[in-house]
Swiss-Prot record:
Region of interest: Disordered: 140-168
Source taxonomy: Bacteria, Bacillati, Bacillota, Bacilli, Lactobacillales
Pfam families in the cross-refs: RRF (PF01765)
Gene3D superfamilies: 3.30.1360.40, Ribosome-recycling factor
CDD domains: RRF
GO cellular component, one term: cytoplasm
Job of this protein: Responsible for the release of ribosomes from messenger RNA at the termination of protein biosynthesis. May increase the efficiency of translation by recycling ribosomes from one round of translation to another.
Family, per entry: Belongs to the RRF family.
Cell compartments where the protein resides: Cytoplasm
Protein name, per record: Ribosome-recycling factor
Signal peptide residue numbers: none
InterPro entries: Ribosome_recyc_fac, Ribosome_recyc_fac_dom, RRF_sf
HAMAP family (UniProt xref): RRF
Amino acid sequence: MNNETIKKAQDNMDKSIKVYQKRLASIRAGVANAALLDNVQVEYYGAPTPLTQMSSITIPEPRVLLITPYDQNSLDDIEHALLASNLGLTPANDGKVIRLVIPQLTGERREEIAKEVGKYAEDAKIAVRNVRREAMDALKKEQKDGNITEDEQRNLEKQVQKITDDSTKKIDQLADEKRKEITQG
């Protein structure tokens, strides 16, 4: 059971980091990035459909996203979804494709985005700490039930602490990289 507890904690911490990475990818840093559109849902024949499943998204220039729908009839639906998505971008529809021009970020907006990155990092760290707490509680229960000795419990708790520290470092590293990308963009 003890190795299962460690493995489960590691898996859950890895999931928290992956969620954080997805969140970071959706933050606009002044450069075109197709991940910006990952969460855009288009009302298509009455059903919400991810934009990425109904169009090809290319980056012809560093600050331009080009959206080419597989079905030309969905062009207006895609445009409406982009306007409603709170991305802060205005789509340009030429009848065949939609262009999204990513504006240059102002210094003030860069600071706001950097704060957002920090907030997301803190959320990810809280998720990691919650996983740590659950693992520690599980180890205490194992020891109380007589399945592991106190020494084994202490050693396993050290392992849990190590993977917690590693996960927190990874989150900090990702946040620093994103902040650097934002401030240099």
